[in-house]
Design a protein with these regions (language model features):
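An N-terminal, well-structured beta->alpha segment
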Residues: 71-129, 135, 215-229
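Structural signal for interior beta-strand "rungs" in well-ordered beta-sheet cores
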Residues: 1-68
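Generic secondary-structure signature for well-ordered alpha-helical cores
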Residues: 61, 100-108, 134, 138, ...
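Structured core elements
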Residues: 2, 49, 55, 113, ...
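Fold-independent oxyanion-binding glycine-rich loops
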Residues: 79-81, 116-117, 166-169, 183-184, ...
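Gly/Ser/Thr-enriched, mixed-charge loops and adjacent short helices
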Residues: 93, 97, 174-229
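N-terminal small/polar loop signature for handling phosphorylated ligands or for N-terminal nucleophile
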Residues: 111-176
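Short beta-strand-to-turn element immediately C-terminal to the catalytic PLP-Schiff-base lysine
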Residues: 14, 87, 179-183
Length: 229
């Protein structure tokens, strides 16, 4: 095994040929598998299992087990939003936390749209995102099933600060795609993506008290509004 300078390992296990670069912090009851590489300034939270031959990229905060794939990155967003295998890369718990991170970039009392397509999977994750957003004091317009162009139009029509649209990847019913949009209905900037990623990785959520939870507005007939407009 190799352990770099300034590392801290608390009550955890390093398996055969695991490599820790400088200033890695591993907290209680975690396991780093054989031949895994943990890069500089990574934080591994308690009770985490990293399976063999994984690479954790620098500055990442690992807060869930790393089983599938070969790498874990600090970055959540890809070239076009966020995508991943349902209940592997993207779980309901992940979606709730990401919803809280997204909501935390707004002031309390702000308003956003959350929509999905008709699949049961997309609808389930829509509700997970909504729970996270509401938990940080942001009001949500819960749209009935919409296609992406209608979701973008809804943001402009309702004059809200942004929106999330959840759908399945074309040709793969096990892969989810999540689009994040700004107040004009356009995809968010890379700067905004980084704000969300930082809030998510640090768990720096603007949690609110019970009496600050905002309304959930259920909109079931937006297509009719769209036709009229």
């Amino acid at each position: 095994n190799y352990i770099g300078h300034g590392c801290e390992i608390r009550g955890s296990i390093l398996c055969n040929k695991a490599k820790l670069k400088n200033y890695v912090h591993i907290f209680e009851n975690s396991i780093v598998g054989d031949n895994s590489i943990i890069n500089e300034r990574v934080v591994i939270k308690p009770n985490i299992k990293i399976w063999p031959q994984k690479t954790i990229e620098p500055l990442a905060i690992v807060d869930r087990n790393i089983i599938w794939g070969s790498k874990h990155s600090k970055s959540i967003f890809g070239e076009h939003g966020i995508s991943g295998i349902i209940n592997v890369d993207i779980s309901p718990e992940f979606a709730t936390r990401l919803g809280a991170a997204y909501g935390s970039i707004f002031k309390k009392g702000s308003k956003v749209v959350v929509s999905s397509t008709t699949s049961n999977s997309a609808r389930m994750f829509k509700h997970a995102f909504i729970s996270g957003i509401l938990s940080v004091g942001v009001e949500v317009f819960n749209m009935s099933s919409l296609l992406t162009p209608l979701a973008r139009h809804a943001i402009n029509f309702l004059s809200v600060e942004g929106g999330i649209h959840i759908k399945l990847s074309e040709g793969n019913p096990n892969k989810l795609k999540v689009d994040f949009m700004d107040s004009k209905g356009a995809s968010i900037s890379r700067v905004t993506e980084r704000k969300i990623e930082n809030s998510f990785s640090r768990e720096d959520f603007k949690r609110c008290s019970g009496d600050e939870i905002c309304r959930l507005n259920n909109i079931t007939d937006f297509k009719n509004y769209y036709v009229r407009s």
